[in-house]
Every structure is written in C-alpha cells, then in structure tokens.
C-alpha cells in the first residue's frame, strides 16, 4: 500500500465513527422527514431535491472514506460540502414558502451548522495528511 494510503487509513477512522458522518446521517433522516410535509405538488420537485441533497452529504463522506488516498477523499468531502450548501438553501426556501415551520427550520439549520463544522474539521485533517506526502 502506498505511503499516503497507509497514512490516510491509519489517521482517519472508519466512516461510521466519524462525527461528520454521524451528524450527516441525522441530517439526512431529518431532511427526509421534513420533505414529507411539503405540499403534494412539491414531492417530485423541492421535496425530492431536499431528500437527495441530504442523502448525498453522508453518502459522500462514506464513499470518500473508502477511497485510496487523501486527494480522492477530499474530492468526496468537497462534494459533501456542496450538497450541504444545497440543503441549507432548500430549507431556507422551504421556510420562506411556509413548507416548514420555525421549529423544524431551527432544528434543520442547527444540524446543517453542526454537520458543516465537523465536515470542515475532517477536511482540514485530510488536507494535513495529503500535505505530508504524495497521494495515490
């Protein structure tokens, strides 16, 4: 196994133990629950987009964790961050359109913030790994 792969797997734990993945999983579940309350005419539009963006955050963290090399892992984490920004935008739209109430919005917003913080920390950790040596 190349040095960068050994470093990647010895420093970063299995994805299920990562706080970023755990928060993202909770966020995905809450996004799916919130989307159920959207109007029928939004179920194949904004509600579906919220579900897919929510799922994408944790799925990309998990998939990136199984990849070889920090550079590839970072790419998946960047995609997870982009999906998180999509979730943030959709929940703001949903609040403004009165599809979700203030309590649901507050809960989802808090989850996106916490997920973002832990995801950013994981990205910094992975960036430190790749800075120490070439990636595969």
Give the label of every model feature segment.
Residues 1-136:
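Amphipathic alpha-helical assembly/interaction segments
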């Amino acid at each position: 196994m190349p040095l960068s792969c050994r470093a990647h797997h010895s420093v970063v734990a299995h994805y299920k133990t990562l706080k970023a993945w755990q928060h993202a999983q909770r966020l995905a579940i809450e996004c799916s629950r919130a989307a159920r309350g959207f109007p029928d005419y939004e179920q194949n539009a904004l509600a579906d987009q919220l579900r897919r963006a929510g799922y994408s955050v944790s799925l990309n963290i998990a998939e990136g964790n199984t990849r070889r090399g920090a550079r590839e892992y970072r790419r998946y984490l960047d995609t997870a961050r982009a999906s998180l920004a999509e979730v943030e935008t959709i929940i703001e739209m949903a609040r403004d359109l009165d599809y979700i109430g203030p309590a649901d919005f507050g809960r989802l917003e808090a989850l996106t913030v916490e997920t973002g913080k832990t995801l950013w920390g994981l990205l910094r950790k992975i960036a430190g790994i790749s800075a120490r040596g070439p990636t595969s």
